Amino acid sequence: MSHKYVKGIAAAMILGLGVAACSSSGHSGKSGSGSTAKTTAITEEAVTGVTFTKNFNPFDVNSFASQVDAKSLLYEPLFEFNALKPGVIHPELGTKYAWSNGGKTLTVTLRSGVKFSDGQPFTSADAAFTFNTIKSNAAANYSGLPTITSVAAPNASTLVLNFQAAQYANLFSILGNTFIVPKHTFSSLSNVATAPVANPVGTGPYVLKSFTTQQVTFVSNPKWWGGKPAINQVNIPYYSGNQAATTALAAGQLDWAGNEIPNLKQLYTSKDPTHNHYWFPGGNTVTLWINQAKGGPLADPKVRQAISAGINRQQLSVKGEYGYEAPATSSSGLILPAQQQFLDSKLANDLSPTANAGKVSSILTADGYSKDSKGFWAKGGKEISFSVEDPTAFTDYYADAQLIAGQMKAVGINATVDGVAAPSWFTDVQDGNFQTAVHWGGGAGGTSNPYPFGQFQYWMDNTLTAKLGASAASNYGRYSNSKAQAAITAFENTNNAAEQQKQLNILENIESTEMPTIPLMYGADWNEYSTARITGWATQSNPYMDPAPDDPEVGYILTHLKPAS
């Protein structure tokens, strides 16, 4: 499951009128005329507890727009990245960019002729204001931007960003996950990170039409630079929980969803096999985090290799994840097939989908372990034993934890399950108060970042971890390896593709042999959609964008949709 920290999302579409070409390389063209409304609903899972509060501030992570992934309807980044196609970058408010000064300076040429939804022109002053806001207010840095030393707007169509260190590796966070806001409306806010924005103004393809605690409605922006979208209305209704949203989806009231739904075929696709579809591409690598700071057997790479060999990934996929998340095939940790181009070929298909008890025995015997009187592997009187901690509310991860514990016992490793409340789990993982945990992949920009470097940084960068008891930004296992750190630093300081791949190979092989985390499955980007009334979806045969209804992609996808004929 790709748990998005506090939320999972379902979005839905109902009908729209207008004619627009669907293009995989850019936005849709002009809409046609007509009066039939198009409706889209984004539904929050019950675990989120999202309250409909009229706040569309993109800097505020607790705003309605942020929590339901509606920012990209109203605001736009400089460029749009396709997580499924690394290197494919679509111009949005920016048209081109260039690095200089050893990766410390990024110059962006901005699109001309763009207007905000209130008719005011968009210029470099707005882009500069956005980045200066993040520079001066850490609480506004929702996209995790690196330290900015200065921002300049030498003319109306040029933005210059200067950073403290080389930032080649953070291109997505800078260009693809920072939403540009209008200076003329945001500059008057007392605290831009928390001030409510009830009447949003942006350059995005939609504008706010109405807001109630039961439904929020957007309509297409007639001033949008890409041409008025063919899908001319977007509705976001309130549902009390995931079950209510699933019922609405099955009843045909929603056309687009992003929820994990058990028995999906029975509840959804079988209702209308011609029109009801789903596609769950792998958007992250789910791993078993290993806490090495507490010492003991888990600090031994050979023990971690043995644990990996004892895991039945196929069983996790089928029983824990309903068959929606494919077993990991490579010990590199890369998301496959999306990141195939970055894979060290010798690490291809080196993970068995099933457990290999013989390999477990071979690894541990060579490492000085033998079975004790209880049938568990031990050395010097100390058994290999650990708990797998996951929230009981994350039913799939909790099921995975139970399966792993059983699989370990079957190969002579004494593992148990520690089911906790979700808030406690987040704190325990960040503070290092756990032994192992099933956890989704991450990195700068999360699952929308197409580049693998962020994942390795998330798993291995010791500048982002913390001592036990203190909250870590990432590297929750407190892994420390000077070779890995050197590769991370080298990658960050080069824009040469061959040199970057060299460093990625080093990191992939460290992940493979040291296993600071153990790859389990490819976490799904949840995406259910209906073609009964809407066409132009991102599909496996036309993956023009990561299909899940999440920011920053959802606004881009909406502009590629059109009513079915």
Where are these regions (language model features)?
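Surface-exposed binding/hinge segments that line
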Residues: T43, A98, T109, S143-S187, ...
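Gly/Pro-rich hinge or "lid" segments in bacterial periplasmic/extracellular proteins
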Residues: L84, G176-K228, Q233, A357, ...
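Alpha-helical secondary-structure segments
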Residues: T123-T130, A156-N162, G204-P205, N232-Q233, ...
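Extracellular/periplasmic solute-recognition and catalytic clefts
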Residues: N141, S150-A152, K209-V219, N235-G295, ...
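N-terminal lobe/hinge region of extracytoplasmic solute-binding protein
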Residues: E45-N101, N132, V201
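Aromatic- and charge-enriched surface segment that lines or borders ligand/interaction sites
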Residues: T95-A138, P154, V160-N162, A245, ...
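Ligand/substrate-recognition segments at binding pockets and active sites
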Residues: T213, S370-A444
